């Protein structure tokens, strides 16, 4: 159990000293990381996360989301509740849109974000990169709307400009 604790602490970006610390000494972000480490130490097949990046700085949020993505890529199931559509675009495969406690829609991420009018009707913001790509395409570019990464977008714009 101790070996597993060391392993998961490292995965969430904390050193072994956290095994001996009082929870009252930890910041909000550290408490969240310790809680996630405790869950991962149980080696669950399904991980349900409710706003998992709340209280984390941008770098810490990215690290946690990358960790959850690796967990999912290892064959495990990750269910994430999030209002951050930038995170949904980059880290999710499927989306369930809830409306007044009811399932409004279930679909793939690319399908959801291709329907600007529907999103506006539901007061859901487009991810920044998706919004930018749609604006470019309305202006005459032909950029793949399923791009999720800024480097890939830069290359696509360069290809359009040079092509």
Predicted regions and their residues:
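Catalytic Walker B motif of ABC-type/P-loop ATPase nucleotide-binding domains
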Residues: 47-50
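Conserved ABC ATPase signature
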Residues: 22-26, 30
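Conserved ABC ATPase "signature" region
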Residues: 2-17
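Conserved catalytic motifs of ABC-family nucleotide-binding domains
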Residues: 43
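Conserved ABC ATPase "signature" C-loop
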Residues: 100-101
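H-loop/switch region of ABC-family ATPase nucleotide-binding domains
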Residues: 82-83
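A short, surface-exposed alpha-helical micro-motif characterized by mixed small hydrophobic
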Residues: 88-90
């Amino acid at each position: 159990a101790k070996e597993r604790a060391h392993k998961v602490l490292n995965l969430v970006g904390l050193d072994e000293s956290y095994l001996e610390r009082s929870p009252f000494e930890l910041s909000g972000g550290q408490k969240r990381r310790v809680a996630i480490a405790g869950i991962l130490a149980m080696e669950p097949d399904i991980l349900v996360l409710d706003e998992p990046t709340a209280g984390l700085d941008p770098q810490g949020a990215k690290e946690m989301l990358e960790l959850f993505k690796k967990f999912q890529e290892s064959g495990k199931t990750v269910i994430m509740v999030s209002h951050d559509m930038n995170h949904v675009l980059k880290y999710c495969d499927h989306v369930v849109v809830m409306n007044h406690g009811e399932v409004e829609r279930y679909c793939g991420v690319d399908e959801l974000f291709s329907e600007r009018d529907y999103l506006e009707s539901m007061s859901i913001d487009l991810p920044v990169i998706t919004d930018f790509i749609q604006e470019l395409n309305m202006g005459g570019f032909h950029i793949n709307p399923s791009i999720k990464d800024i480097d890939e977008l830069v290359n696509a714009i360069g290809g359009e400009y040079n092509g």
